[in-house]
Amino acid sequence: MNISMILKNDSFVHTANLNSNPLYDLLIDLQETKEILINLGDKTYRNDRLYMAQFSSGVELYKILFDKEHQKEAGITGEEVKMLNKVIEQNSSIENDEYDKIVNDIIQKQVNEPYALLCFYLTNTLPYHANTPNTLLNVRRELLLLTNDLQDFVTACPFCFPNLQFHPDLVNTLRGLSAPFKKYKFEIIRHLAAINDIFHPLYKENQNGGINENLKVLKAEGELSCSLEGNAESARKRLTFQFKNNLDIDEEVVCEPHTKLEGTNQPGDTEYRYDRIYFHGGKENIANGKTLIAHIGGHL
């Protein structure tokens, strides 16, 4: 799923820099974020009222971009001006009315299309706001909730969880969930985010260590239930999946660790459920060591 991000005008106002972050560091983060968007085929937009934002005290952004005297007074280097110009100029234009509607919808949390806001200064974590690669990941996961089609969901997952490799049969396993995907998707995304952000780095650091210790951390920090199978021999029979290795050869992998989808966490749905996400910590010869997501669906 491709997304569209719009530069947020008031995030370029100097008073928004509550943490006094260095200009160069902010530009590096924003430039890297934009490059990720471009490389993935996403769209970025600019509303031209942005040029009137008070980027420095009493000085509009357009003066900073195009007037060397104002650049000097603001203490902005030539390299920083080039970076700032690149961030602002290399976007499609969006009209005032459309910009205002999108920003209002996002602030009101009434997002129905894959739009979000690309910010310069971003002090607090806000839904659908990003200014770094990490906050962009959060935005992608928030927008993933708009997806109800299983194939679209699976196709979008690698962009939202870059540390994970997904089995090609996931669309079929998702059909076996004990509740409709539309009800379950928030909880599934929460579990995948925990495996991507918490479990995968732990496993990469200590592949030869105890998997149980990694699962304990995943359980505590991810606030979810997870474990190995009780019978290892039975697990080998039931939980062996094939993944393509780096030689494009199918390789069997036992995906015994699993998180427990014990409920949809939807209001009014109190039913205890037995769905699972089965995975493997990863092998260097398969998808460059990403954690392998083998099954999202019913208990196997």
Residue ranges of predicted features:
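Arginine residue identity/basic-tract feature
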Residues: 46-49, 140-141, 175, 185, ...
